[in-house]
A protein has these predicted regions:
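Active-site and substrate-binding clefts of carbohydrate-active enzymes
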Residues: 16, 93-152, 161-164, 170-186, ...
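Structural beta-strand segments of beta-rich domains
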Residues: 19-23, 512-516
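Asparagine-centered strand-capping/turn motif at beta-strand->loop junctions
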Residues: 27-29, 518-522
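Short proline/glycine- and polar residue-rich coil/turn motifs
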Residues: 52-59, 543-550
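Short, hydrophobic beta-strand segments
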Residues: 62-69, 553-558
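Terminal connector regions
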Residues: 70-92, 557-586
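Metal-dependent polysaccharide deacetylase catalytic core of the NodB/CE4 family, i.e.
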Residues: 161-261, 307-327, 364, 406
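Catalytic domains of cell-wall/extracellular-matrix polysaccharide-remodeling enzymes
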Residues: 239-295, 366-387
Length: 587
């Protein structure tokens, strides 16, 4: 026999004392006329109860209740052994609404090998696939755009440059995607590409209309704070941020002034890079980054200044509530109730954030799709936006874009070097056997890149390859990818070695003078130092050898000469020294 099902909702989440609460009850699967007990509950105690009548086979009943005292309540409907509850909050309307910044990090690493073949379709699949069927017919990235367009709520999106880069790659070139037994080519004419265009156009329009804020980031999602501390890759990270901003501007038409710091991994050594690139604000973690600066419960909601940067600290508990708990909704009733719980939790912070900002920051997609796509988590997202829109109209909450914040409360002098997890362990040591191999490959690639650029100067292709090598996603313990890191590291090393091996050196002797000729068969000019050591002296000659040409140097004598080809700054040996020994003829 089919079980009776009950759905219960109210017209809003937040009410003033004494305001009418419209209650809707839907009962399905009735075989006979039944009583429905409608109860108002506070702290597990029944406040009021009334009995309604339900008529088979299904009934939709509307009723009204009033609650005069402020607080959090549940409204319960019970029938035929089944019960559902939905939470509401009775709260006095504030003089000024609670300012709220909601940040979603919509991101995919560039799932591409140096061969040009994608080893993962996720940037595309999570946009166009009906992963939340039967409720929605698209993936999370497009769903976000459609829902914000529908409810017009101010939301801040980090559409990561690596995600945008892949969308743009598809539109410009088409993509090759690796399968189990074949490689699929998806051309720009594919019908699914229309959904990618819709996502781009919707986000772009919403940004230009001032509905959403778009954050930029580094191009390939490096663990920037860790990398700059461990490897001091200042030039690479400066380049990555510049290129990330270019991608955001080219694909969306947005000149972003805020950025998402990958893995929220901060280091003071990043500060000048961000400031020099025109970044005005970032979001960090309220637990691990604010840390010892927390003085009271209002500290996390204050706006801080750090050099050029305005810093918002996310409410970690509120963010994690959605990421790891409320997202487990298994039906529509739970999705609605969980959205209400989030709004209520938000409003419970109003007394601590009266002149500040409550910030939530979390992944935009993972809480809906991992371990498998959950249609009711997607429904939860829509309910959150619906109730936020309602709370804004009623004057309780004001969702805002971070860039409109002009004031700050405190200067923060020092911010710990750490991630949203409080350490780098997730990327370096949780699976140390594999991760240590990855970091060894990364170190080798960084060393070769440094030597190459010291000799040949900045190289876009090489920097892109190194950025792909260092993407944090492929070092994450649960998703380590030896093939991706290994192939891109090899790409860096082999290009650098090909270039360095294209430098030649030859000798000729004329009138007891040794002529040393350095040739350059690489595509870029080479800056070098030629070290010449004799038993008596050591001399260095700085030389620039243009691409496809050679430069001669003449020295007097050549007995026991050691000749070294060196990089110009660090004097790194480009190859083993060459020793010339002149045999002394005995008479």
């Amino acid at each position: 026999m089919k079980a009776v099902s009950i759905e219960l909702t109210t017209n809003k989440v937040l009410y003033e004392p004494g305001e009418d609460i419209t209650v809707n009850v839907m009962v399905r699967g009735l075989m006979s006329r039944e009583d429905i007990e409608l109860t108002v509950i506070k702290d597990s105690q029944e406040i009021t109860k009334r009995v309604l009548q339900a008529i088979p086979p299904e009934s939709e009943i509307m009723d009204y209740v009033r609650i005069n005292d402020v607080g959090t309540y549940e409204i319960s409907a019970r029938c035929c052994g089944s019960e559902v509850r939905t939470p509401v909050m009775i709260i006095n309307r504030p003089e000024t609404p609670l300012r709220f910044v909601l940040v979603f990090h919509n991101h995919q690493p560039i799932h591409k090998y140096p061969s040009g073949i994608y080893h993962g379709p996720w940037a595309f699949q999570h946009t166009w696939s009906p992963e939340f069927y039967p409720i929605y017919d698209v993936g999370p990235y497009l769903l976000h755009a459609r829902l914000v367009n529908k409810y017009r709520v101010s939301v801040t999106y980090n559409l990561s440059p690596s995600l945008l880069w892949q969308w743009d790659d598809l539109l410009r070139n088409g993509v090759f995607i690796e399968g189990a037994d074949h490689v699929e080519y998806i051309g720009p004419w594919d019908s699914r590409v229309g959904l990618i265009k819709e996502a781009i156009n919707t986000y772009s329009r919403l940004a230009n209309e001032g509905v959403i804020e778009v954050l930029t980031s580094f191009l390939a999602h490096p663990i920037a704070g860790y990398l700059i501390e461990k490897f001091e890759v200042y030039d690479l990270l400066r380049w990555e941020l510049s290129r990330g901003k270019e991608v955001t501007r080219r694909v969306l038409g947005v000149n972003a002034v805020g950025m998402w710091l990958p893995e929220l991994y901060f280091s003071e050594k990043l500060r000048n890079i961000l400031c020099d690139e025109g970044i005005r604000f970032i979001v960090l973690d309220g637990v691990y980054h604010l840390g010892e600066a927390i003085k009271d419960r209002s500290s996390i909601y204050r706006v801080y200044r750090h050099d050029c940067l305005t810093i918002l600290f996310r409410d970690t508990a509120l963010s994690d509530l959605l990421s790891f708990q409320l997202n487990k909704a298994s039906n529509a009733q739970e999705a609605d109730a969980n959205a209400r719980r989030l709004i209520i939790e938000l409003m419970m912070r109003i007394n601590y954030a009266r002149d500040g900002v409550v910030t939530m920051a979390l992944d935009g997609e993972n809480w809906m799709i991992l371990p498998t796509p959950n249609p009711y988590a997607a429904l939860l997202l829509e309910k959150i936006m619906m109730y936020l829109s309602q709370a804004k109209s009623d004057g309780y909450v004001m969702p805002i874009r971070p860039s409109i914040i002009k004031e700050f409360h405190d200067e923060i002098k020092e911010i710990p070097t750490t991630s949203w997890l409080g350490s780098p362990a997730k990327w370096i040591s949780e699976r140390a056997d594999i991760q240590s191999r990855l970091w060894s490959m990364a170190q080798a690639a960084i060393s070769k890149w440094r030597l190459y650029e010291e000799v040949f100067g900045e190289d876009e292709e090489l920097r892109m390859s190194l950025a792909m090598t260092l993407d944090s996603d492929y070092y994450w313990a649960e998703f380590v990818n030896v093939n991706h890191v290994g192939e891109w590291a090899h790409s860096v090393i082999s290009r650098a070695e090909d270039a360095l091996n294209s430098l030649g050196i030859r000798f000729s002797l004329e009138n007891d003078h040794l002529e040393i000729t350095v040739s350059n068969n690489w595509v870029k000019d080479a800056n070098l130092v030629l070290g010449i050591e004799t038993p008596e002296t050591y001399l260095e000659y700085s030389i620039k050898v243009q691409s496809g040409s050679s430069e001669p140097i003449r020295i007097n004598g050549f007995n026991n000469v050691v000749i070294s080809l060196l990089s110009p700054k660090t004097r790194t040996q480009i190859r083993k020294p060459i020793k010339i020994v002149r045999e002394v003829t005995k008479h």
